[in-house]
Amino acid sequence: TEFEHYLKKAGINPKDLAKIEKEQPELFSKLTSDDPKSVRSRAKKLTALRKKGYMEGKLGMIIDGTGHNVGKIEKQKRELGLQGYDTYMVFVNTTLDVALERNSKRDRVLPEKIVTQSWKDVQKNIGRFQQIFENNFVIVDNSDTLDEKQATKKFSTYVKKYADKWAKSPIKNPMGKFWVKKQLQLKNAMGK
Protein backbone atom coordinates (compact mmCIF):
# COMPACT_ATOMS: atom_id res chain seq x y z
CA THR A 1 0.00 0.00 0.00
CA GLU A 2 0.97 3.64 -0.26
CA PHE A 3 1.08 3.83 3.53
CA GLU A 4 3.62 1.00 3.69
CA HIS A 5 5.62 2.65 0.91
CA TYR A 6 5.85 5.91 2.84
CA LEU A 7 6.68 4.10 6.09
CA LYS A 8 9.61 2.37 4.39
CA LYS A 9 10.67 5.66 2.83
CA ALA A 10 10.76 7.12 6.37
CA GLY A 11 12.98 4.21 7.46
CA ILE A 12 10.25 2.38 9.36
CA ASN A 13 9.53 -1.30 8.92
CA PRO A 14 5.73 -1.65 8.54
CA LYS A 15 5.90 -4.80 10.73
CA ASP A 16 6.95 -2.56 13.64
CA LEU A 17 3.83 -0.38 13.62
CA ALA A 18 2.08 -2.18 16.53
CA LYS A 19 5.31 -2.14 18.52
CA ILE A 20 5.77 1.57 17.82
CA GLU A 21 2.25 2.30 19.07
CA LYS A 22 3.07 0.62 22.41
CA GLU A 23 6.65 1.78 22.87
CA GLN A 24 6.67 5.13 21.06
CA PRO A 25 3.11 6.50 21.12
CA GLU A 26 4.28 9.99 20.10
CA LEU A 27 5.91 8.62 16.95
CA PHE A 28 2.86 6.46 16.19
CA SER A 29 0.63 9.51 16.54
CA LYS A 30 2.93 11.54 14.30
CA LEU A 31 2.89 8.83 11.62
CA THR A 32 -0.88 8.33 11.65
CA SER A 33 -2.19 11.82 12.41
CA ASP A 34 -4.25 14.00 10.09
CA ASP A 35 -1.33 16.42 9.78
CA PRO A 36 -0.76 16.95 6.03
CA LYS A 37 2.91 16.01 6.45
CA SER A 38 2.22 12.70 8.23
CA VAL A 39 2.93 9.40 6.50
CA ARG A 40 -0.76 8.49 6.63
CA SER A 41 -1.90 11.81 5.12
CA ARG A 42 0.65 11.64 2.31
CA ALA A 43 -0.43 8.07 1.51
CA LYS A 44 -4.10 9.09 1.48
CA LYS A 45 -3.32 12.01 -0.83
CA LEU A 46 -1.52 9.73 -3.30
CA THR A 47 -4.39 7.23 -3.22
CA ALA A 48 -6.90 10.03 -3.87
CA LEU A 49 -4.85 11.30 -6.83
CA ARG A 50 -4.73 7.82 -8.35
CA LYS A 51 -8.46 7.38 -7.87
CA LYS A 52 -9.10 10.78 -9.49
CA GLY A 53 -7.05 9.74 -12.52
CA TYR A 54 -9.02 6.53 -12.88
CA MET A 55 -12.30 8.41 -12.60
CA GLU A 56 -11.28 11.04 -15.17
CA GLY A 57 -10.45 8.24 -17.59
CA LYS A 58 -13.67 6.40 -16.68
CA LEU A 59 -11.56 3.35 -15.92
CA GLY A 60 -12.86 0.48 -13.85
CA MET A 61 -11.39 0.18 -10.39
CA ILE A 62 -11.44 -1.99 -7.32
CA ILE A 63 -11.39 -0.14 -4.03
CA ASP A 64 -10.10 -2.27 -1.19
CA GLY A 65 -10.92 -1.28 2.38
CA THR A 66 -11.86 -2.65 5.76
CA GLY A 67 -15.46 -1.46 5.68
CA HIS A 68 -15.36 -0.18 9.26
CA ASN A 69 -16.59 3.27 8.18
CA VAL A 70 -19.94 2.79 6.46
CA GLY A 71 -20.31 6.53 5.82
CA LYS A 72 -17.06 6.58 3.84
CA ILE A 73 -18.17 3.64 1.69
CA GLU A 74 -21.59 5.20 1.13
CA LYS A 75 -19.97 8.51 0.10
CA GLN A 76 -17.62 6.76 -2.34
CA LYS A 77 -20.53 4.84 -3.85
CA ARG A 78 -22.55 8.03 -4.28
CA GLU A 79 -19.60 9.91 -5.86
CA LEU A 80 -18.89 7.06 -8.25
CA GLY A 81 -22.58 6.79 -9.15
CA LEU A 82 -22.66 10.50 -10.01
CA GLN A 83 -19.73 9.88 -12.38
CA GLY A 84 -21.65 7.13 -14.18
CA TYR A 85 -20.16 4.11 -12.46
CA ASP A 86 -22.13 1.02 -11.53
CA THR A 87 -20.91 0.00 -8.09
CA TYR A 88 -20.67 -3.39 -6.45
CA MET A 89 -19.37 -4.77 -3.18
CA VAL A 90 -17.69 -8.07 -2.43
CA PHE A 91 -17.77 -8.33 1.36
CA VAL A 92 -15.05 -10.74 2.44
CA ASN A 93 -15.90 -11.88 5.94
CA THR A 94 -13.80 -13.69 8.51
CA THR A 95 -13.93 -14.48 12.21
CA LEU A 96 -12.27 -12.17 14.72
CA ASP A 97 -9.78 -14.88 15.69
CA VAL A 98 -8.74 -15.32 12.06
CA ALA A 99 -8.51 -11.54 11.55
CA LEU A 100 -6.22 -11.23 14.58
CA GLU A 101 -4.09 -14.19 13.50
CA ARG A 102 -3.69 -12.84 9.97
CA ASN A 103 -2.85 -9.40 11.32
CA SER A 104 -0.03 -10.87 13.41
CA LYS A 105 1.49 -12.36 10.25
CA ARG A 106 1.13 -9.30 7.99
CA ASP A 107 3.97 -7.13 6.79
CA ARG A 108 2.27 -4.22 8.56
CA VAL A 109 1.03 -5.43 11.94
CA LEU A 110 -1.67 -3.22 13.42
CA PRO A 111 -2.32 -2.91 17.15
CA GLU A 112 -4.71 -5.67 18.31
CA LYS A 113 -7.20 -3.17 19.74
CA ILE A 114 -7.49 -1.44 16.34
CA VAL A 115 -8.06 -4.75 14.53
CA THR A 116 -10.66 -5.83 17.11
CA GLN A 117 -12.57 -2.54 17.00
CA SER A 118 -12.44 -2.41 13.22
CA TRP A 119 -13.72 -6.01 12.97
CA LYS A 120 -16.62 -5.20 15.34
CA ASP A 121 -17.49 -2.07 13.34
CA VAL A 122 -17.44 -4.04 10.10
CA GLN A 123 -19.75 -6.72 11.50
CA LYS A 124 -22.23 -4.02 12.56
CA ASN A 125 -22.14 -2.59 9.03
CA ILE A 126 -23.05 -5.72 7.05
CA GLY A 127 -26.78 -4.97 7.02
CA ARG A 128 -26.20 -1.36 6.02
CA PHE A 129 -23.94 -2.45 3.15
CA GLN A 130 -26.70 -4.76 1.93
CA GLN A 131 -29.09 -1.79 1.92
CA ILE A 132 -26.63 0.48 0.12
CA PHE A 133 -25.58 -1.97 -2.61
CA GLU A 134 -28.83 -3.97 -2.81
CA ASN A 135 -28.48 -6.67 -5.51
CA ASN A 136 -24.90 -5.59 -6.21
CA PHE A 137 -23.66 -7.02 -2.91
CA VAL A 138 -22.22 -10.43 -2.12
CA ILE A 139 -20.76 -11.86 1.08
CA VAL A 140 -18.02 -14.47 0.93
CA ASP A 141 -16.36 -16.18 3.88
CA ASN A 142 -12.59 -16.38 3.94
CA SER A 143 -12.07 -17.78 7.45
CA ASP A 144 -11.03 -21.32 6.62
CA THR A 145 -7.38 -20.64 5.87
CA LEU A 146 -4.80 -18.82 7.96
CA ASP A 147 -1.89 -18.97 5.54
CA GLU A 148 -1.58 -15.45 4.12
CA LYS A 149 -0.70 -16.58 0.60
CA GLN A 150 -3.63 -19.01 0.46
CA ALA A 151 -6.00 -16.43 1.96
CA THR A 152 -4.83 -13.80 -0.53
CA LYS A 153 -5.25 -16.23 -3.42
CA LYS A 154 -8.75 -17.15 -2.25
CA PHE A 155 -9.61 -13.46 -1.83
CA SER A 156 -8.33 -12.69 -5.34
CA THR A 157 -10.35 -15.58 -6.75
CA TYR A 158 -13.54 -14.28 -5.13
CA VAL A 159 -12.97 -10.72 -6.30
CA LYS A 160 -12.04 -11.82 -9.83
CA LYS A 161 -15.10 -14.06 -10.07
CA TYR A 162 -17.51 -11.28 -9.17
CA ALA A 163 -15.58 -8.47 -10.88
CA ASP A 164 -15.53 -10.44 -14.14
CA LYS A 165 -19.25 -11.17 -13.87
CA TRP A 166 -20.13 -7.56 -13.14
CA ALA A 167 -17.74 -6.11 -15.74
CA LYS A 168 -19.38 -8.23 -18.44
CA SER A 169 -22.89 -7.13 -17.50
CA PRO A 170 -24.48 -4.16 -19.30
CA ILE A 171 -24.09 -0.72 -17.72
CA LYS A 172 -27.13 0.16 -15.61
CA ASN A 173 -26.26 3.69 -14.49
CA PRO A 174 -28.03 6.20 -16.80
CA MET A 175 -25.07 8.61 -16.62
CA GLY A 176 -22.71 5.80 -17.54
CA LYS A 177 -24.90 4.79 -20.47
CA PHE A 178 -24.98 8.40 -21.66
CA TRP A 179 -21.18 8.70 -21.42
CA VAL A 180 -20.67 5.50 -23.45
CA LYS A 181 -23.17 6.71 -26.07
CA LYS A 182 -21.33 10.05 -26.39
CA GLN A 183 -17.96 8.31 -26.68
CA LEU A 184 -19.28 6.06 -29.45
CA GLN A 185 -20.68 9.11 -31.27
CA LEU A 186 -17.29 10.84 -31.02
CA LYS A 187 -15.54 7.73 -32.27
CA ASN A 188 -17.92 7.42 -35.22
CA ALA A 189 -17.64 11.15 -36.02
CA MET A 190 -13.86 10.80 -36.19
CA GLY A 191 -14.23 7.91 -38.62
CA LYS A 192 -12.67 5.25 -36.45
Features from the language model and the residues they span:
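PAPS-dependent sulfotransferase catalytic domain
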Residues: 42-56, 70-75, 112-131
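Conserved phosphate-donor/acceptor-positioning beta-strand/loop module used by diverse small-molecule
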Residues: 68, 81-102
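Conserved substrate/cofactor phosphate-moiety recognition/catalytic segment
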Residues: 1-59, 71
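Loop/turn-to-beta-strand initiation segments
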Residues: 57-61, 86-88
